[in-house]
Every structure is written in C-alpha cells, then in structure tokens.
C-alpha cells in the first residue's frame, strides 16, 4: 500500500492550480471561478505539507461557500476534486441535522462517517497490495480440500495449474470459511447519542477473539465461489489493521473534504413565524462552528482532529442570504464563490464536451444492444432549448433537467432496443420535436413529466 499511496500523492503534489482546473474541465462545463477557488484551496494543502516546524500546524484550510442554484455544478466540482486528490469525501445536507439534545443526527456524525470512508479507502488499497499473496494462500486452502494436506508437491502443482486455468471452477468442494452469520439481537440507538448505534454483544464471540480464534463453518461450494470468499479472508489476515486505522485517521485529518449542501436552509431569515424552527436552525449552525474551526471528535477508531479538514458549504440562497448565517459561521467560510446559472450554450456543452457526457452515456447504453444512435447538431440544440424553457417556466434545476428530457426522448428506443439489433438511428430536431413538443407546450404536464 505504501508504494501505491506514495506514487499517487507525488502525482497530486505536483498538480498546479491550472492543472487542477484542466482536470476539472474534463468533466465540468464552465464555473471557472469555483474551479479556481477549489484549485487554490487544494494547492494550499500541498504547500502546507511542505512547511517546516510549528508553523505548519497554524496554517488552516480556507473553507469555501459556494452560492448557486441546484444543478449548476457545485457538488460535482467537490466530488471530482476528491477523486483527483485521493481524498476521503463526504457529502451531507445541512437539513439532516438537529441541535444537540434533540432527536436526530448530530453534526459530529459527519466526522465519524468521513473516517469510515477513509478506513474503507485504506483497506481497499492495502488489499490490492496483498492480493497476490492472498490469492496464493486461498489456492493452498482449496488444494488442501481437493487433494488433502498430505498430498505430494507434484500432485498439488498439477491441481494448482488446473485451478489457475479455470478447469476446476465448477468442481464442488467442502471447505471451512469464516462464519459471517450475524449473532445477537441486532443493534439499537444509544440514548443521548443520535446517529450512533450499538450491537448486542455475543459473549462467546468476544472470548473467542480474545483467545485469538474466530468462528468458522464448513460449507459445500464450487471452487470459483470458494476463491471469491477465501481471498478477502486471507487479505484480512495479511493487512495490519492498526496501521490501516492510523493511516485512515491521518488521511481524514489532513486530506478529508466535507461538502455540506443546502446550508441556506439552516439560515435564520427572520421572516418565518416559527420561532422554534429558527432557534433549531441557529443551534445547528452553532454546532457546526467548532467542527469547522477545529475540534476533536471521538470515533470508534479513536479521536480525530478537524483542524485541517476542508469544508465546502453550498446553497442556492433563493430566500435566505449568506449574511443570514451566523456571523461566526460566515467567518469560518472566508472564500465565497458565486456559480452562474446555465445558459443554452452551457447546456449544449454539457451534452457534448465532458468525457462522460450524457450523450456518450446514452449512446453507450443503447450500443450494448447493437443499436447505434447519432445526434445531429440541430437535435442537440433543440434539447438544450427545451431544457432552458422548462427550467424557466417550471423550476430551475440546472443540468439535471437534461436527464429527464433525455429519458423521455429516448424512452421508446430504450424499450424496443433489444428487438432492433443492427439498426442505426439518427436523432434530429424533428425527432426531438415529435417526442417532446406536446409535453413542453403543456406546462402542467411538463411539471409532472420533466
């Protein structure tokens, strides 16, 4: 795992802000200001790691507040950034939380979930590194079942070759595997700790583990199924769990990215008559303050410091304004970026330019049925026109409108594709108009369908 991680981090340490923006441009159209802001924030993380001495601990991330309508790319920018940087990434809506002392999730669960993601990431990398050894151990266990532990090396080698070639995939064997059957009465919520749950402990299991043993049971299964079960078992034995947890906590603390969406929904507008709701919203904001400023959160893996976690908050701010947030919270989100609403040209680019554009996705899906679809320029323009029209007349959901329009446009083709093998279908502006014009012109219908 060390080699894999080091190589990746060297690559991302070498990324300049302009290179980061170029990487984001491969998947996201427009929003240059937002891309620039996150690129600088990421580069500053790399710079901090190069600073020597105590000064490094004093340099904290400049958290970001993104302001923009739904579907303009706020979440996608943060998600792509996390993928680009090998960072644990956790997205949550601010409305999911309640003030400490009330029924619901508390804000500290954000960090618990972030660490869980980091642990899973580190485990996956570690298992990749020990995969060859784990596979060898799994084959040895299957050979013990097939030819016995006392068989000659010549016999074992012969059967090993057959396993590797897949000749014995459908051979049934009897083998001992870990017993993963859940024991006990399930789990229950811990009073006073919303979001945390506790399982009923099985005393025999606890004593068995303390003595270094683990429960197994003998099963009959095919060789290929046995390999799928035993390789992960052997991987677990080969990796250092304590080291994984230490690395995961370090990764979460120094490279974690938390994306808090809909933060405008917990802003106190003062216009609402529901005073209790206002107090509750303000309470959630106050609970977020220490988390964003820097505190220590206890998790099942150990204490985690939040001082250097990058927080990106976002909201549409249609009703509330950023100034309606608590002044202390505003101060902890010093970088503000306003994302632009999407134009017709943006919609056209979204359909065509990204490496994983919607047109490429739908073409690939239908192409699996040996049916090939091609969109003319006039069709793309018409789709973009309709997306903008419905966004203006019904509700502006940005690029997400394209998903619903394309689903309706290609519904008949998707349904009949399996019976149209070998056909090539050209989708032009007339085809788009025939499929969608009735829905678009009837706004009441458009509200439900698109």
From Swiss-Prot:
Belongs to the ClpX chaperone family. HslU subfamily. Gene3D superfamilies: 1.10.8.60, P-loop containing nucleotide triphosphate hydrolases. InterPro entries: AAA+_ATPase, ATP-dep_Clp_protease_ClpX, ATPase_AAA_core, Clp_ATPase_C, HslU, P-loop_NTPase. Pfam families: AAA, AAA_2. The keyword rRNA-binding does not apply. SUPFAM superfamilies: P-loop containing nucleoside triphosphate hydrolases. A double ring-shaped homohexamer of HslV is capped on each side by a ring-shaped HslU homohexamer. The assembly of the HslU/HslV complex is dependent on binding of ATP. GO terms for biological process: protein unfolding; proteolysis involved in protein catabolic process. GO terms for molecular function: ATP binding; ATP hydrolysis activity; peptidase activity; proteasome-activating activity. ATPase subunit of a proteasome-like degradation complex; this subunit has chaperone activity. The binding of ATP and its subsequent hydrolysis by HslU are essential for unfolding of protein substrates subsequently hydrolyzed by HslV. HslU recognizes the N-terminal part of its protein substrates and unfolds these before they are guided to HslV for hydrolysis. It is found in: Cytoplasm. GO terms for cellular component: HslUV protease complex. PANTHER family: ATP-DEPENDENT CLP PROTEASE ATP-BINDING SUBUNIT CLPX-LIKE, MITOCHONDRIAL-RELATED, ATP-DEPENDENT PROTEASE ATPASE SUBUNIT HSLU. Keywords: ATP-binding, Chaperone, Cytoplasm, Nucleotide-binding. It comes from Rickettsia akari (strain Hartford). Its main location: cytoplasm. SMART domains: AAA (SM00382), ClpB_D2-small (SM01086). This is ATP-dependent protease ATPase subunit HslU. ATP binds at residues 29, 71-76, 261, 328, 400.
């Amino acid at each position: 795992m060390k080699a894999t991680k080091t190589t990746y981090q060297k690559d991302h340490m070498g990324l300049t802000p302009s290179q980061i923006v170029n990487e984001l441009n491969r998947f996201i159209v427009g929003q240059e200001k937002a891309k620039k802001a996150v690129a600088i924030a990421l580069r500053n993380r790399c710079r901090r790691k190069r600073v020597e001495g105590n000064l490094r601990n004093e340099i904290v991330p400049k958290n970001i507040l993104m302001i923009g309508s739904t579907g303009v790319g706020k979440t996608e920018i943060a998600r792509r950034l996390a993928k680009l940087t090998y960072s644990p990434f956790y997205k949550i809506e601010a409305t999911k939380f309640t003030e400490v002392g009330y029924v619901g999730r508390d804000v500290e669960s954000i960090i618990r979930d972030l660490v869980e993601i980091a642990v899973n990431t580190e485990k996956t990398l570690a298992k990749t590194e020990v995969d060859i050894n784990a596979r060898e151990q799994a084959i040895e266990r299957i050979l013990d079942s097939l030819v016995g532990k006392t068989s000659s090396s010549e016999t074992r080698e012969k059967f090993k070759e057959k396993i590797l070639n897949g000749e014995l995939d459908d051979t049934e064997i009897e083998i001992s595997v870990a017993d993963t059957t859940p024991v006990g009465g399930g789990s229950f919520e811990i009073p006073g700790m919303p979001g945390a749950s506790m399982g009923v402990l099985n005393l025999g299991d606890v004593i068995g583990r303390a003595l270094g043993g683990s429960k197994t049971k003998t099963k009959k299964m095919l060789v290929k199924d046995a390999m799928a079960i035993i390789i992960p078992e052997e991987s677990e034995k080969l990796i250092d769990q304590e080291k994984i947890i230490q690395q995961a906590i370090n990764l979460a603390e120094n490279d974690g990215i938390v994306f808090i969406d809909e933060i405008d929904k917990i802003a106190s507008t003062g216009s609402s008559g529901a005073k209790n709701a206002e107090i509750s919203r303000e309470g959630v904001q106050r609970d977020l303050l220490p988390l964003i400023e820097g505190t220590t959160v206890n998790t099942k893996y150990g204490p985690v410091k939040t001082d250097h976690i990058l927080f990106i908050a976002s909201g549409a701010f249609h009703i509330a304004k950023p100034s309606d947030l608590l002044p202390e919270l505003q101060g902890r989100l010093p970088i503000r970026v306003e994302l632009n609403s999407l134009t017709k040209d943006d919609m056209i680019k979204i359909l065509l330019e990204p490496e994983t554009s919607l047109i490429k996705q739908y073409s690939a899906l239908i192409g699996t049925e040996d049916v090939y679809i091609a969109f003319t320029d006039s069709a793309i323009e018409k789709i973009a026109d309709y997306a903008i029209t419905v966004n203006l007349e019904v509700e502006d959901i940005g690029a997400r409108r394209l998903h619903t329009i394309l689903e309706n446009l290609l519904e008949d083709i998707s349904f009949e594709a399996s019976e149209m093998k070998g056909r090539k279908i050209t989708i032009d502006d007339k085809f788009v108009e025939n499929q969608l014009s009735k829905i678009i012109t009837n706004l009441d219908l458009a509200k439900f369908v698109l």
